[in-house]
A protein has these predicted regions:
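Residues forming the Rossmann-fold NAD(P)(H) cofactor-binding site
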Residues: 45, 113, 255
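Contiguous beta-strand/loop segments that form the cofactor/metal-binding neighborhood of enzyme cores
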Residues: 166-167, 179-382, 388-434
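Beta-strand-loop-alpha-helix segment that lines the small-molecule cofactor/substrate pocket
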Residues: 108-109, 113-161, 175
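N-terminal secretory signal peptides and thylakoid transit peptides that target proteins
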Residues: 1-16
Length: 434
């Protein structure tokens, strides 16, 4: 049998297993896992929906510091066997509840590290959304906590659970595209010139605990864009565009694409990073750039991530994706599938594969199965820590205006002026301690 075919069958079989609804008996014939969900915005409710389709899972609690989100999440659980989930405003109640087995953390990014570490210390297994952290040091501690407390921690980079992404990564690893020396990832769009607007600071809305929302982040007056929740629920929260809480498109979408790139190249990390970008187009109060280009030097190839909000024209008429450029051919890959275009004179045949699933449901099934088996999940925290760090380094290069040399053994850069961006000080009383 062709080696690529054999390896793909192994990979596909592993991914396909996760597409089955989780039916493992974790603690007894009729005993279900008890789950709690922290952060019930659009992403949290999406995870809640996929998790509730799994068997042997009872959603015991949902948690949010904004009444509207909390009430909506409780309502979603009304018809589940076992009755509706309890609505909780303080996540520490969930961590103290010994009856809860697993937690899903889908808060704004700046809360991910603290909640994940504390959940591991409390004996919970964790499904945490991507990007898993806001600075490099936090990701290192998250991995340390998972290993120290022997917890299963799955990150929300669900593309790894989609069959066509697994097949595409195997194609790159197999050499079918020849020597791949250049990879391009992008997200292009055309925003309105006013962007997200310039709302003034004001009092927080009723039903929101703004101080708790900020948590370990610096004290700031309430601003509707920093909070970012759309009253009409039309878009994901705009906190993503402020450095205190996130890393802009570089970490929000870049982590999806670069996670697949690093998967295809056996989880390797970049050694050199340079970046250029600015707010050239939109006139709003966001802090992250609307135009960005980051170049990563890996052993043997270069990868580029690009984002722009002032022009939507792109390769293959796609707003985002990955191009793997090899000596025998090029592969375009996104959530819709992949397409291979041979180089002139190459024996490589043109081919394509359509997506059959986005991977969300399979990702949850894989997580719950690993809770049972105690094996590492498809997107183990260490893999997403690597991918998130790669994205964060792009922002560090941008903000420091330096070309970075990265040491993956020590998780640091060789440029002293840039090291201040690798960690952050937590606001009292929060401390990130493994």
């Amino acid at each position: 049998m062709d080696p690529l075919r054999r390896d793909f069958l192994k990979t596909s079989a592993a991914v396909a297993l996760t597409s089955q609804i989780f039916t493992g008996n974790v603690r007894g014939a009729n005993d279900r896992l008890s789950a709690a969900f922290i952060g019930m915005g659009k992403m949290g409710r999406s995870n809640l929906g996929y998790a509730m389709r799994q068997e042997n899972l009872l959603v015991s609690a949902v948690c949010d510091i904004f009444d509207r989100n909390l009430n909506t999440a409780v309502q979603m659980t009304q018809k589940q066997p076992g009755g509706p989930a309890k609505g909780i405003r303080d996540f520490r109640e969930i961590l103290a509840d010994k009856s809860i087995d697993v937690v899903c953390i889908a808060t704004p990014d700046h809360w991910h590290p603290y909640m994940t570490v504390e959940a591991c210390k409390a004996g919970k297994d964790v499904y945490v959304e991507k990007p898993v952290c806001v600075v490099v040091d936090e990701g290192v501690k998250m991995v340390q906590a998972a290993r120290k407390y022997k917890r299963v921690v799955q990150a929300g980079t669900m593309q790894r659970s989609a069959v066509h992404f697994a097949k595409a990564a195997e194609i790159v690893r197999s050499g079918e595209l020849g020597k791949v020396t250049f990879v391009r990832c992008w997200n292009y769009g055309l925003s309105e010139p006013e962007g997200i607007g310039n709302p003034p600071d004001q009092e927080p809305p009723p039903g929101l605990d703004w101080d708790m929302w900020l948590g370990p982040a610096p004290q700031r007056p309430f601003n509707s864009n920093r909070f970012g929740v759309d009253p009409a629920d039309r878009y994901f929260s705009r906190f993503r565009w402020f450095w205190d809480y996130a890393g802009g498109m570089m970490t929000d979408w870049g982590v999806h694409w670069l996670d697949i790139v690093q998967w295809a190249f056996d989880e390797g990390m970049p050694t050199g990073i340079s970046a250029f970008g600015e707010k050239f187009y939109v006139k709003d109060n966001r802090e992250t750039p609307d135009t960005l280009q980051v170049t990563y030097e890996y052993p043997g190839f270069l990868a580029v991530y690009e984002n722009r909000e002032g022009n939507a024209q792109s390769m293959f008429d796609k707003s985002g994706g990955i191009l793997f450029n090899g000596s025998k051919g090029t592969m375009y890959l996104d959530r819709g599938g992949y397409k291979i275009v041979p180089e002139k004179g190459s024996a490589l045949e043109a081919s394509e594969m359509k997506s059959t699933s986005g991977g969300n449901r399979e990702h949850w099934a894989n997580f719950l199965d690993c809770v049972k088996t105690r094996e590492k999940p498809t997107s183990d925290i260490e893999k997403c820590q690597h991918s998130t760090t790669t994205c964060l380094l792009g922002n560090v290069a941008l903000r420091s205006k330096l070309r970075l040399d990265f040491d993956a053994q020590k998780w640091t850069v060789n440029q002293p002026e840039a090291k201040k961006y690798l960690s952050r000080e937590y606001r009292n009383p929060w401390k990130l301690v493994v």
